Amino acid sequence: MKNLFEAATVSEIQERMAHLRPDSERQWGKMNVAQMLAHNSAWMEMAAGLNSPPRALIGRIFGRVAKKKVLGSEQPIGRNMPSEKSLIVSDEREFVAERERLLQWTNAFAAAGPSGCTTHPHCFFGPMTPLEWARMAYKHLDHHLRQFGV
Protein backbone atom coordinates (compact mmCIF):
# COMPACT_ATOMS: atom_id res chain seq x y z
CA MET A 1 0.00 0.00 0.00
CA LYS A 2 1.26 3.46 -0.88
CA ASN A 3 2.49 5.70 1.92
CA LEU A 4 4.09 9.12 2.31
CA PHE A 5 7.43 7.69 3.44
CA GLU A 6 8.01 6.58 -0.18
CA ALA A 7 9.67 9.18 -2.42
CA ALA A 8 7.78 7.98 -5.51
CA THR A 9 4.45 8.33 -3.72
CA VAL A 10 5.30 11.85 -2.53
CA SER A 11 6.22 12.77 -6.11
CA GLU A 12 2.94 11.33 -7.40
CA ILE A 13 0.92 13.36 -4.87
CA GLN A 14 2.85 16.54 -5.65
CA GLU A 15 2.42 16.07 -9.41
CA ARG A 16 -1.32 15.69 -8.89
CA MET A 17 -1.36 18.83 -6.72
CA ALA A 18 0.34 20.72 -9.57
CA HIS A 19 -2.76 20.07 -11.70
CA LEU A 20 -5.04 21.87 -9.24
CA ARG A 21 -6.19 25.37 -10.17
CA PRO A 22 -7.84 28.09 -8.07
CA ASP A 23 -11.08 27.39 -9.94
CA SER A 24 -10.92 23.57 -9.73
CA GLU A 25 -14.44 22.37 -9.01
CA ARG A 26 -15.24 19.90 -6.29
CA GLN A 27 -17.08 16.74 -7.23
CA TRP A 28 -18.49 16.32 -3.72
CA GLY A 29 -18.31 17.99 -0.32
CA LYS A 30 -18.40 21.61 0.78
CA MET A 31 -14.81 22.92 0.69
CA ASN A 32 -13.36 24.85 -2.21
CA VAL A 33 -9.91 23.91 -3.47
CA ALA A 34 -7.96 26.35 -1.26
CA GLN A 35 -9.90 25.21 1.82
CA MET A 36 -9.19 21.58 0.91
CA LEU A 37 -5.46 22.30 0.72
CA ALA A 38 -5.58 24.03 4.12
CA HIS A 39 -7.56 21.10 5.56
CA ASN A 40 -4.89 18.68 4.35
CA SER A 41 -2.12 20.79 5.88
CA ALA A 42 -4.01 20.76 9.20
CA TRP A 43 -4.27 16.95 8.89
CA MET A 44 -0.51 16.73 8.28
CA GLU A 45 0.06 18.92 11.36
CA MET A 46 -2.02 16.42 13.34
CA ALA A 47 0.08 13.53 11.99
CA ALA A 48 3.21 15.39 13.09
CA GLY A 49 1.80 16.03 16.57
CA LEU A 50 1.32 19.80 16.28
CA ASN A 51 -2.37 19.48 17.06
CA SER A 52 -4.05 16.61 18.86
CA PRO A 53 -7.84 16.59 18.65
CA PRO A 54 -9.41 14.48 21.40
CA ARG A 55 -10.80 11.05 20.57
CA ALA A 56 -14.43 11.19 19.53
CA LEU A 57 -16.86 8.83 21.26
CA ILE A 58 -17.87 7.29 17.94
CA GLY A 59 -14.20 6.71 17.18
CA ARG A 60 -13.73 4.95 20.50
CA ILE A 61 -16.60 2.65 19.56
CA PHE A 62 -15.92 2.04 15.85
CA GLY A 63 -12.43 3.42 15.22
CA ARG A 64 -10.42 0.20 15.45
CA VAL A 65 -12.72 -1.66 13.05
CA ALA A 66 -12.84 1.29 10.66
CA LYS A 67 -9.04 1.60 10.72
CA LYS A 68 -8.67 -2.04 9.70
CA LYS A 69 -11.16 -1.54 6.87
CA VAL A 70 -9.53 1.65 5.55
CA LEU A 71 -5.89 0.61 5.94
CA GLY A 72 -6.45 -3.03 5.07
CA SER A 73 -7.59 -2.25 1.55
CA GLU A 74 -6.25 -0.46 -1.51
CA GLN A 75 -9.77 0.91 -2.00
CA PRO A 76 -9.92 4.73 -1.83
CA ILE A 77 -11.72 6.48 1.01
CA GLY A 78 -15.38 6.98 0.12
CA ARG A 79 -17.03 10.28 -0.69
CA ASN A 80 -18.61 12.56 1.92
CA MET A 81 -16.89 11.02 4.93
CA PRO A 82 -17.18 13.19 8.07
CA SER A 83 -14.18 15.28 9.17
CA GLU A 84 -12.85 16.07 12.62
CA LYS A 85 -14.44 19.44 13.44
CA SER A 86 -11.13 21.11 14.32
CA LEU A 87 -9.76 20.23 10.87
CA ILE A 88 -12.67 21.74 8.92
CA VAL A 89 -11.67 24.92 7.09
CA SER A 90 -14.59 27.23 6.30
CA ASP A 91 -12.91 30.63 5.94
CA GLU A 92 -11.49 31.85 2.65
CA ARG A 93 -7.90 30.86 1.88
CA GLU A 94 -5.39 31.88 -0.77
CA PHE A 95 -4.83 29.04 -3.23
CA VAL A 96 -1.14 29.50 -4.07
CA ALA A 97 -0.12 29.93 -0.41
CA GLU A 98 -2.11 26.87 0.68
CA ARG A 99 -0.76 24.70 -2.11
CA GLU A 100 2.80 25.71 -1.23
CA ARG A 101 2.13 25.02 2.45
CA LEU A 102 0.86 21.52 1.67
CA LEU A 103 3.80 20.83 -0.66
CA GLN A 104 6.11 21.77 2.21
CA TRP A 105 4.20 19.49 4.59
CA THR A 106 4.40 16.49 2.28
CA ASN A 107 8.16 17.01 1.93
CA ALA A 108 8.64 17.53 5.67
CA PHE A 109 6.58 14.46 6.59
CA ALA A 110 8.54 12.24 4.21
CA ALA A 111 11.90 13.67 5.32
CA ALA A 112 11.11 13.22 9.03
CA GLY A 113 10.15 9.60 8.49
CA PRO A 114 8.71 7.46 11.28
CA SER A 115 10.31 9.53 14.05
CA GLY A 116 8.37 12.58 12.84
CA CYS A 117 4.96 11.01 13.48
CA THR A 118 2.88 11.77 16.53
CA THR A 119 2.46 9.26 19.31
CA HIS A 120 -0.99 10.68 20.08
CA PRO A 121 -3.90 8.56 18.91
CA HIS A 122 -5.80 9.58 15.80
CA CYS A 123 -9.04 11.32 16.81
CA PHE A 124 -11.17 8.61 15.16
CA PHE A 125 -8.98 5.58 14.44
CA GLY A 126 -7.10 5.58 17.75
CA PRO A 127 -3.47 4.53 18.18
CA MET A 128 -1.56 4.28 14.90
CA THR A 129 1.97 3.25 14.05
CA PRO A 130 4.12 5.61 11.96
CA LEU A 131 3.54 3.40 8.90
CA GLU A 132 -0.23 3.57 9.49
CA TRP A 133 0.03 7.38 9.69
CA ALA A 134 1.99 7.40 6.42
CA ARG A 135 -0.56 5.15 4.70
CA MET A 136 -3.47 7.20 6.02
CA ALA A 137 -1.74 10.42 4.92
CA TYR A 138 -1.58 9.05 1.37
CA LYS A 139 -5.18 7.84 1.42
CA HIS A 140 -6.41 11.16 2.85
CA LEU A 141 -4.56 13.21 0.24
CA ASP A 142 -5.66 10.87 -2.55
CA HIS A 143 -9.29 11.21 -1.38
CA HIS A 144 -9.18 15.00 -1.56
CA LEU A 145 -7.27 15.16 -4.83
CA ARG A 146 -9.90 12.87 -6.36
CA GLN A 147 -12.51 15.23 -4.88
CA PHE A 148 -11.11 17.89 -7.23
CA GLY A 149 -10.58 15.62 -10.21
CA VAL A 150 -6.81 15.13 -10.07
Locate predicted features.
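Short alpha-helical hairpin
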Residues: 10-15, 79, 113-120
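Short, amphipathic alpha-helical "lid/cap" segments that border enzyme active or binding sites
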Residues: 10, 14, 37, 99, ...
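A charged, amphipathic interaction segment
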Residues: 88-136, 140-141
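Structural signal for well-ordered, non-membrane alpha-helices
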Residues: 14, 18, 44-45, 103-110, ...
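Short, contiguous alpha-helical
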Residues: 24-71, 119-150
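Globin-like tetrapyrrole-binding proteins
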Residues: 1-7, 17-18, 28, 82-95, ...
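Alpha-helical bundle segments that constitute or directly flank the non-heme di-iron/ferroxidase center
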Residues: 1-22, 39-41, 48
